[in-house]
Amino acid sequence: MKPWLSKSADTLRRQINSAFPDRDKRSDGWIGDSRHSATKSDHNPALPSGVVRAIDIDSDLGGPANNAQYLANQLRILGKTDKRLAYVIYNKRIASPILFWKWRPYRGYAHTSHIHISFTPLGDQDKRKFKLPILGE
């Protein structure tokens, strides 16, 4: 099984790269490392397909310091209607369908250097762009 990135995850990453061409990518990622493989993580390939349903986007988008929070918040709001999004984690908070996409404390890894975005199986083959104002959509 060869791991591959969800089409929706790939589309969103491309949109972010286009909107922020000079952004820092040091904390970007999608495929889990050995630390992830021992845990339940959307960075691990799903069996039997091999799809990876998560991306990390570095919080330094190359512009105003609050751009990452703005992006995370727009993703949170979009999650209310776009069922391709499973959850968003950023800066010690998580938003998901639990509590209808309201931010709540996250007690796992703090995610202060990057935004974690997980996708549902609905996004596996869906290449539609995400309608986010910060990305010019």
Tell me the role of every PLM-derived stretch.
Residues 86-89, 105, 129:
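Intrinsically disordered, low-complexity N-terminal regions enriched in serine/proline/glycine
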Residues 97-102, 129-131:
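Short amphipathic beta-strand/extended segments with alternating polar/hydrophobic composition
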Residues 105, 119-121:
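Secondary-structure transition/turn motif
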Residues 3, 121-137:
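Low-complexity, Gly/Ser/Thr/Pro-rich intrinsically disordered linker/tail segments
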Residues 109-113, 126:
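Short glycine/proline-enriched turn or capping motifs at secondary-structure junctions
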Residues 1-100, 112-119:
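Secreted/periplasmic proteins that engage bacterial cell-wall peptidoglycan
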Residues 103-109:
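Short proline/glycine-enriched turn/loop segments at secondary-structure junctions
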